[in-house]
């Protein structure tokens, strides 16, 4: 009985934490973000200009920009559609209990895992759908006006807290508020795209069976000494994502791998080996690779000299975003305008959605409004992600990224480098992990180092 009472206290405590976080972050979500019409907006490799959209000097945050070889001028709706189409993964509550804990929410501690999920989700979007893909229903999401965000938050948590007191533990999925446009796909290609869209989101479901779900990521984190409720830094999450992809058994995921840079160095031969390790005479296709590079943009604070570097990274068509944030908060950085970064915030706590249900609601997996913050507020610890479809794509990307690093670096040495050869050629050999021990001894040492370096996340 005593243990049961303790569990109930813990559950009530998480309710209060969730309520506080939602009250706090709903104000941020409802606050309008403004974009200048005189500066380009860049979003994951595409560039949008709003200069010719209208005569107002400022545009509300529901518009944005993206980067590529071409510029999209004067079309706020195109940016908005592009931004909303990115997959948004946030705190959730009332999901199945995490093993070896009483936790049914990640509110207050899971934000870096969520931003890592968002980066991986963007890599999967590129892999299966391509950068040009946008969600047909993106512009039909209900407006997150100032009244609805706040009132819904209050109503939701009043009901949620009352339910916890009465012992009502029923799981509820949010009602669909999208216009009834689904199911009217014009062709087989659109049907296929929507199927992959749903499949990708389902891989991040909050249940033990989801290949990239929170429960699975926490299991991999245990191998590094982490547990549910602990804080995770960007570098640790990079290694957890790598293990999650390596261990994924879904047939659609066999053509993808993840490489994590060692000490800010990408060893080209190691990357190519990962891309070609399963190539046979009957199947000459290379694997696609997501390259994750943990870096530090300064000492205690971010060095503003690295601003051009961050801009350069987010301007590349290969970029899938940055796991970063500001002290005590993790964000998924996807673009910029002038000296401000554009991000998606995982701190808004939403209800559990059962993604195993056919036609589960998609609305809560897409953010209706981008947010901006000054580069100066960025915490120096972050992880940068790139996607390359094949070996040829990787070779081209490494050349382009190297040029960008040289141009943007004001220091004698760039933040990270691409080096020909294998890591073992430079005496950085890491012990191979056995099936029982998913992380090598060197990786365990890295986890301990990363844990002491990185900021605390709430």
Curated annotation (Swiss-Prot):
Cellular location(s): Cytoplasm
InterPro entries hit by this protein: ATG4_LIR, Papain-like_cys_pep_sf, Peptidase_C54, Peptidase_C54_cat
Catalytic activity: [protein]-C-terminal L-amino acid-glycyl-phosphatidylethanolamide + H2O = [protein]-C-terminal L-amino acid-glycine + a 1,2-diacyl-sn-glycero-3-phosphoethanolamine
Source organism superkingdom: Eukaryota
Pfam families documented for this protein: ATG4_LIR (PF20166), Peptidase_C54 (PF03416)
Modified residues (Phosphothreonine): 452
Record-annotated disulphide pairs: none
Sites of N-acetylmethionine modification: 1
PANTHER family from the UniProt entry: CYSTEINE PROTEASE ATG4 (PTHR22624), CYSTEINE PROTEASE ATG4C (PTHR22624:SF38)
Function noted in UniProt: Cysteine protease that plays a key role in autophagy by mediating both proteolytic activation and delipidation of ATG8 family proteins. The protease activity is required for proteolytic activation of ATG8 family proteins: cleaves the C-terminal amino acid of ATG8 proteins MAP1LC3 and GABARAPL2, to reveal a C-terminal glycine. Exposure of the glycine at the C-terminus is essential for ATG8 proteins conjugation to phosphatidylethanolamine (PE) and insertion to membranes, which is necessary for autophagy. In addition to the protease activity, also mediates delipidation of ATG8 family proteins.
Designated name of the protein: Cysteine protease ATG4C
Taxonomic lineage of the native organism: Eukaryota, Metazoa, Chordata, Craniata, Vertebrata
């Amino acid at each position: 009985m005593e243990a049961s009472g303790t569990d109930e206290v813990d559950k009530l405590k998480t309710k209060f934490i969730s309520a506080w976080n939602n009250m706090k972050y709903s104000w941020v979500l409802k606050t309008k973000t403004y974009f200048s019409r005189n500066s380009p907006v860049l979003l994951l490799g595409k560039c949008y200009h709003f200069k010719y959209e209208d005569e107002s000097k400022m545009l509300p945050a529901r518009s944005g920009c993206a980067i590529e070889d071409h510029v999209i001028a004067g079309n706020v709706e195109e940016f908005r559609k592009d931004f909303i189409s990115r997959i948004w993964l946030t705190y959730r509550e009332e999901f199945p209990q995490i093993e070896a804990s009483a936790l049914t929410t990640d509110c207050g501690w899971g934000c870096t895992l969520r931003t890592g999920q968002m980066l991986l989700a963007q890599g999967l979007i590129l892999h299966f759908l391509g950068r040009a893909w946008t969600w047909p229903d993106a512009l039909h999401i209900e407006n997150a006006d100032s009244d609805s965000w706040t009132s819904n938050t209050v109503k939701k948590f009043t009901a949620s807290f009352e339910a916890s007191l009465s012992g009502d533990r029923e799981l509820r999925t949010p009602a669909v508020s999208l216009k009834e446009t689904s199911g009217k796909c014009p062709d087989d290609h659109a049907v296929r795209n929507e199927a992959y869209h749903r499949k990708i989101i389902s891989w991040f479901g909050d249940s033990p069976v989801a290949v990239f779900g929170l429960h699975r990521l926490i299991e991999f984190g245990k191998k590094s000494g982490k547990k549910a409720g602990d804080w995770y830094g960007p570098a640790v999450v990079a290694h957890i994502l790598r293990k999650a992809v390596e261990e994924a058994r879904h047939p659609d995921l066999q053509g993808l791998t993840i490489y994590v840079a060692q000490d800010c160095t990408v060893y080209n031969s190691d990357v190519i080996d990962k891309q070609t390790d399963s190539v046979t005479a009957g199947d000459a296709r290379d694997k696609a690779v997501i390259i994750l590079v943990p870096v530090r943009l300064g000492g205690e604070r971010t060095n503003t000299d690295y601003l051009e570097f961050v801009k350069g990274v987010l301007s590349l068509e290969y970029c899938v975003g940055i796991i970063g944030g500001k002290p005590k908060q993790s964000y998924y950085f996807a673009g910029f305008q002038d000296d401000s970064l554009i991000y998606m915030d995982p701190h808004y706590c939403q209800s559990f959605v059962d993604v195993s249900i056919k036609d589960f609601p998609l609305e809560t997996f897409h953010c209706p409004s981008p947010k901006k913050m000054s580069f100066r507020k960025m915490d120096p610890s972050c992880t940068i992600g790139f996607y390359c479809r094949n070996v040829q794509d990787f070779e081209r990307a490494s050349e382009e990224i190297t040029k960008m690093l040289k141009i943007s670096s004001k220091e004698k040495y760039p933040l990270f480098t691409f080096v020909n050869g294998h890591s073992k050629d430079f005496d950085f050999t890491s012990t191979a992990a056995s099936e029982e021990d998913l992380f090598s001894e060197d990786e365990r040492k890295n986890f301990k180092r990363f844990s002491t370096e990185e900021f605390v996340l709430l």
